[in-house]
Amino acid sequence: MNKKYDAIVIGGGHAGLEAAFAISHKGRNTLLLTFNSKKLGMMPCNPSIGGPAKGIITREIDALGGMQGLWADLATIQLKMLNLSKGPAVRALRAQIDKEKYSQLAYEYVLKQPNLELLEGVAEEVIVDENGYFKGVLVENIGLIEAKVCVITTGTYMNSRILRGQDITTSGPDNEKTTPKLSASLAKLGFTLQRLKTGTPPRIYSDSINFDEVEQEVLSDVNISFSSRSNLKKPKQIACYLTYTTPETHRIIEENIHRSPMYSGVIEGIGPRYCPSVEDKIVKFPDKERHQIFFEPETADGAITHVNGLSTSMPIDVQELMIKSIPGLRNAKVQKWAYAIEYDALDPLQLKESLETKLVHNLFTAGQINGTSGYEEAAAQGLIAGINAALKLEDKDPIVILRNHGYIGVLIDDLVTKGTKEPYRMLTSRAEYRLLLRNDNADDRLSEYAYNSGMISKEEYQKVLDKYKLIDDEIQRLNTTYLSGKSDVALKYNITNGSTLLNVISRPDVDPSDIIPNFPYLEEITTMVRLHGYIEKQKSDANKAVRLENLKIPEDLNYLDVKNIAIEARQKFEKIRPATIGQASRISGINPADIQMLMFHLESRNKKNYDQN
């Protein structure tokens, strides 16, 4: 095999796949190193893509030229648009995925991808040269493989262990391998590691479930997709089911809580706040009589059911009692028991906005190693890290997505500016400009980034420009066209003469298809018209913030020279080393006075340099 590459990507999960495809797409010779080539893009937790905010991230990945949206569309077995009764800012797609098909698609695409080589192996050590640049990776039973750049995407596999009660196994998810030596290697290089935890529920053989005892979910009528490249018809919808925990479930958990590693002190890692274990729910919400449990098929044949909402680290004998206490599962046969998994992750404050590490040049990290949870968050980071690794090879500036341009920008900015001590999950509430970051306009927001970084072609970019020109032209036409008071539409909605079509379509009681029945982008134009004032207000606010993003802070700035700032501010500036005034202002504990003094210092420094020149 070749032992020299332009790039090495460690890990074949959602982050690693996006990174490998991005770098190889840009013509760089890339090695994707993974434990098991037949388990690329695994879904060890819930078999779904999308959801609030997360579905918009997948749309953004597609707009940037990534793969997750396309594969999700091809493997979808149920699709719904969430929050339809709410505003456009929080609407998002969620797809139930055939997890085996998704993994198979990833494998097939990897084999067909030019400039991309797949290798099974265990990364043991990151090698750095005397100047602090990444040099290569030591691989078990193979030796040193050299490359110019590297993206580490180890997920939950780094120095991981699985816990069920007192039964503790050193392994990755689903009894895969783990990488304790790689974790030790990063610590030796000076990286600060933290211990995190997540969990997964049991899987049940579907033919042992009594579906008559549970509620079938109402299927949505959605004809939309994550990817602009899939051109799929609406998938055949496969139902999920809803049931609940019972007082008996709660009694079993309460009586055995001392046997949960979460509460016996065995687990050191911090778990995800927004995806708690079932024992966590019972302990933290003792007054709640029941908790939702969803039965979700893992594949199109529906043979195995994922019991969403029953994540636990209880021992197997307790799990069995819990499962039998839930309606529909009285006679359940378990295919896989639930478990908690603990793993090493980096403190993301050690990263630049490009996701390159501050300690080692040309070394990038992405996904759960950076302290996030979720397939979508991982894929987004992998894509950005991959693009920026390739741009580094071209000696070009990295792409940094602004907070008003994408949830991906919010995600990365939060990580590298604020850090996280628990698995970070993207929420709509984290985005201050969420009305701008809608499900319907990801291509408008991000296609320029994709084109400028070489991820989409000129033709693809022009297609997006043409789409929004068509929308703008139609808005102009609507604004200059008046509705006859005698028309069917006017009579239907009791509209008098003198109203423009734009005014008519802006009314929430009007069906826009009555006004422009054949317009191809009905959702986009309706949202833009009806929320025009609110959108313009958020754009104005965002533009003010962007001015601070344009005020760069030199990498070599000595913060000891900055006078009249708080000691806490000086320490945080020194640790995080923000790239811009905007980023500096978002650091926790930094007050406006500190920012003013920092700006004053930079102005004085720039004036002094100008005078000297």
UniProtKB/Swiss-Prot annotation:
Keywords attached to this entry: Cytoplasm, FAD, Flavoprotein, NAD, tRNA processing
Gene3D superfamilies: FAD/NAD(P)-binding domain (3.50.50.60), GidA associated domain, C-terminal subdomain (1.10.150.570)
Subunit-level organization: Homodimer. Heterotetramer of two MnmE and two MnmG subunits.
Residues at which NAD(+) binds: 271-285
Main location: cytoplasm
Protein name per UniProt: tRNA uridine 5-carboxymethylaminomethyl modification enzyme MnmG
Localization annotation: Cytoplasm
Highest taxon listed in the record's lineage: Bacteria
UniProt cross-references to InterPro entries, sorted A to Z: FAD/NAD-bd_sf (IPR036188), GIDA_C_N (IPR049312), MnmG (IPR004416), MnmG-rel (IPR002218), MnmG-rel_CS (IPR020595), MnmG_C (IPR026904), MnmG_C_subdom (IPR047001), MnmG_C_subdom_sf (IPR044920)
Function, in words: NAD-binding protein involved in the addition of a carboxymethylaminomethyl (cmnm) group at the wobble position (U34) of certain tRNAs, forming tRNA-cmnm(5)s(2)U34.
UniProt keyword annotation of Membrane present: no
Binding site for FAD: G11, G12, G13, H14, A15, G16
GO molecular function: flavin adenine dinucleotide binding
Any GO BP annotation: tRNA methylation
